[in-house]
Protein backbone atom coordinates (compact mmCIF):
# COMPACT_ATOMS: atom_id res chain seq x y z
CA UNK A 1 0.00 0.00 0.00
CA UNK A 2 1.22 3.48 -0.82
CA UNK A 3 0.57 4.86 2.66
CA UNK A 4 2.78 2.33 4.43
CA UNK A 5 5.63 2.76 1.95
CA UNK A 6 5.49 6.55 2.33
CA UNK A 7 5.60 6.36 6.12
CA UNK A 8 8.60 4.01 6.13
CA UNK A 9 11.02 6.72 4.98
CA UNK A 10 11.72 10.06 6.65
CA UNK A 11 12.28 11.82 3.31
CA UNK A 12 8.93 10.69 1.93
CA UNK A 13 7.15 11.71 5.17
CA UNK A 14 8.79 15.13 4.91
CA UNK A 15 7.74 15.46 1.29
CA UNK A 16 4.19 14.41 2.15
CA UNK A 17 3.88 17.06 4.87
CA UNK A 18 5.46 19.65 2.59
CA UNK A 19 2.96 18.96 -0.20
CA UNK A 20 0.00 19.02 2.19
CA UNK A 21 0.98 22.30 3.86
CA UNK A 22 -0.42 25.65 2.89
CA UNK A 23 3.02 26.73 1.66
CA UNK A 24 2.58 24.49 -1.38
CA UNK A 25 0.24 25.86 -4.00
CA UNK A 26 -2.65 23.81 -5.28
CA UNK A 27 -1.22 23.91 -8.79
CA UNK A 28 2.16 22.56 -7.62
CA UNK A 29 0.39 19.88 -5.58
CA UNK A 30 -1.71 18.96 -8.62
CA UNK A 31 1.32 18.65 -10.92
CA UNK A 32 3.90 17.07 -8.63
CA UNK A 33 2.06 15.83 -5.56
CA UNK A 34 1.15 12.22 -5.00
CA UNK A 35 -2.40 10.99 -4.70
CA UNK A 36 -1.83 10.58 -0.98
CA UNK A 37 -0.80 14.22 -0.56
CA UNK A 38 -3.95 15.31 -2.39
CA UNK A 39 -6.12 13.09 -0.18
CA UNK A 40 -4.47 14.32 3.02
CA UNK A 41 -4.86 17.93 1.88
CA UNK A 42 -8.54 17.31 1.13
CA UNK A 43 -9.08 15.78 4.59
CA UNK A 44 -7.25 18.75 6.14
CA UNK A 45 -9.58 21.16 4.36
CA UNK A 46 -12.74 19.17 5.09
CA UNK A 47 -12.02 18.81 8.81
CA UNK A 48 -10.41 22.22 9.33
CA UNK A 49 -13.01 23.37 11.87
CA UNK A 50 -12.78 20.18 13.92
CA UNK A 51 -8.99 20.38 13.94
CA UNK A 52 -9.12 24.02 15.04
CA UNK A 53 -11.51 23.09 17.87
CA UNK A 54 -9.07 20.42 19.03
CA UNK A 55 -6.23 22.96 18.94
CA UNK A 56 -8.37 25.42 20.92
CA UNK A 57 -8.64 22.78 23.67
CA UNK A 58 -4.82 22.78 23.97
CA UNK A 59 -3.96 26.40 24.78
CA UNK A 60 -0.29 27.16 24.70
CA UNK A 61 0.59 24.31 22.35
CA UNK A 62 1.78 26.53 19.52
CA UNK A 63 3.53 28.90 21.92
CA UNK A 64 5.41 26.02 23.51
CA UNK A 65 6.41 24.74 20.08
CA UNK A 66 7.63 28.20 19.19
CA UNK A 67 9.78 28.23 22.34
CA UNK A 68 11.13 24.78 21.39
CA UNK A 69 9.51 23.25 24.45
CA UNK A 70 8.22 20.06 22.91
CA UNK A 71 7.00 18.12 25.94
CA UNK A 72 3.45 19.47 25.65
CA UNK A 73 3.34 18.49 21.99
CA UNK A 74 4.66 15.01 22.79
CA UNK A 75 2.12 14.41 25.56
CA UNK A 76 -0.94 15.94 23.94
CA UNK A 77 -0.53 15.28 20.23
CA UNK A 78 2.00 12.59 19.43
CA UNK A 79 0.62 10.13 21.97
CA UNK A 80 -2.88 10.56 20.56
CA UNK A 81 -2.00 9.89 16.93
CA UNK A 82 -3.93 6.86 15.72
CA UNK A 83 -2.58 4.54 13.03
CA UNK A 84 -5.04 1.70 13.53
CA UNK A 85 -6.63 2.09 10.09
CA UNK A 86 -5.92 3.89 6.84
CA UNK A 87 -8.56 6.54 7.50
CA UNK A 88 -7.28 7.31 10.98
CA UNK A 89 -3.72 7.44 9.70
CA UNK A 90 -4.71 9.96 7.02
CA UNK A 91 -6.61 12.00 9.63
CA UNK A 92 -3.55 11.98 11.92
CA UNK A 93 -1.34 13.21 9.09
CA UNK A 94 -3.90 15.91 8.21
CA UNK A 95 -4.02 17.02 11.85
CA UNK A 96 -0.23 17.36 11.99
CA UNK A 97 -0.32 19.31 8.72
CA UNK A 98 -2.89 21.65 10.29
CA UNK A 99 -0.66 22.16 13.33
CA UNK A 100 2.27 22.84 11.00
CA UNK A 101 0.25 25.47 9.13
CA UNK A 102 -0.90 27.18 12.33
CA UNK A 103 2.60 27.05 13.83
CA UNK A 104 4.22 28.57 10.73
CA UNK A 105 1.82 31.54 10.72
CA UNK A 106 3.19 33.09 13.90
CA UNK A 107 6.59 31.53 14.41
CA UNK A 108 10.02 33.06 14.21
CA UNK A 109 11.55 29.65 13.49
CA UNK A 110 12.52 28.63 9.98
CA UNK A 111 10.07 26.72 7.81
CA UNK A 112 12.58 23.91 7.28
CA UNK A 113 13.02 23.41 11.02
CA UNK A 114 9.27 23.23 11.60
CA UNK A 115 8.79 20.86 8.66
CA UNK A 116 11.66 18.64 9.82
CA UNK A 117 10.35 18.56 13.38
CA UNK A 118 6.80 17.60 12.39
CA UNK A 119 8.08 15.05 9.89
CA UNK A 120 10.36 13.48 12.47
CA UNK A 121 7.58 13.25 15.04
CA UNK A 122 5.19 11.65 12.54
CA UNK A 123 7.82 9.23 11.29
CA UNK A 124 8.94 8.22 14.79
CA UNK A 125 5.34 7.77 15.98
CA UNK A 126 4.61 5.57 12.96
CA UNK A 127 7.71 3.44 13.51
CA UNK A 128 7.02 3.17 17.23
CA UNK A 129 3.46 1.97 16.59
CA UNK A 130 4.69 -0.56 14.02
CA UNK A 131 7.25 -1.96 16.46
CA UNK A 132 4.59 -2.26 19.17
CA UNK A 133 2.26 -4.10 16.80
CA UNK A 134 4.99 -6.51 15.74
CA UNK A 135 6.10 -7.12 19.32
CA UNK A 136 2.52 -7.93 20.33
CA UNK A 137 2.21 -10.37 17.44
CA UNK A 138 5.30 -12.32 18.51
CA UNK A 139 4.96 -15.05 21.10
CA UNK A 140 5.97 -13.89 24.55
CA UNK A 141 8.22 -16.86 25.22
CA UNK A 142 10.54 -18.68 22.92
CA UNK A 143 9.98 -22.39 22.45
CA UNK A 144 12.33 -24.41 24.64
CA UNK A 145 15.53 -25.43 22.93
CA UNK A 146 16.54 -29.08 23.11
CA UNK A 147 19.19 -29.83 25.70
CA UNK A 148 22.50 -31.41 24.85
CA UNK A 149 21.38 -34.74 26.32
CA UNK A 150 18.25 -34.78 24.15
CA UNK A 151 20.32 -34.05 21.03
CA UNK A 152 22.74 -36.91 21.82
CA UNK A 153 19.81 -39.25 22.45
CA UNK A 154 18.30 -38.36 19.07
CA UNK A 155 21.63 -39.04 17.36
CA UNK A 156 21.84 -42.49 18.97
CA UNK A 157 18.22 -43.42 18.37
CA UNK A 158 16.97 -41.67 15.24
CA UNK A 159 13.22 -41.66 14.83
CA UNK A 160 12.02 -44.38 12.52
CA UNK A 161 9.66 -43.13 9.88
CA UNK A 162 6.83 -45.63 9.42
CA UNK A 163 5.40 -46.21 5.98
From Swiss-Prot:
Identify one Gene Ontology CC term for this UniProt entry: host cell plasma membrane
Q: Which keywords has UniProt assigned to this entry? A: Apoptosis, Early protein, Host cell membrane, Host membrane, Host nucleus, Host-virus interaction, Inhibition of host apoptosis by viral BCL2-like protein, Membrane, Modulation of host cell apoptosis by virus
Q: Where is this protein found?
A: Host cell membrane; Host nucleus envelope; Host nucleus lamina
Q: Say which family it is in.
A: Belongs to the adenoviridae E1B 19 kDa protein family.
The entry's protein name is: E1B protein, small T-antigen
Matching InterPro entries = Adenovir_t-Ag_E1B_19kDa, Bcl2-like
GO BP field: symbiont-mediated suppression of host apoptosis
Amino acid sequence: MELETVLQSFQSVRQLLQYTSKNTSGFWRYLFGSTLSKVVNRVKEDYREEFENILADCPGLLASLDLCYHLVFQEKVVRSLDFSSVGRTVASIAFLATILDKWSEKSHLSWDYMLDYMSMQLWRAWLKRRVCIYSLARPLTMPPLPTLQEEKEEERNPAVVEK
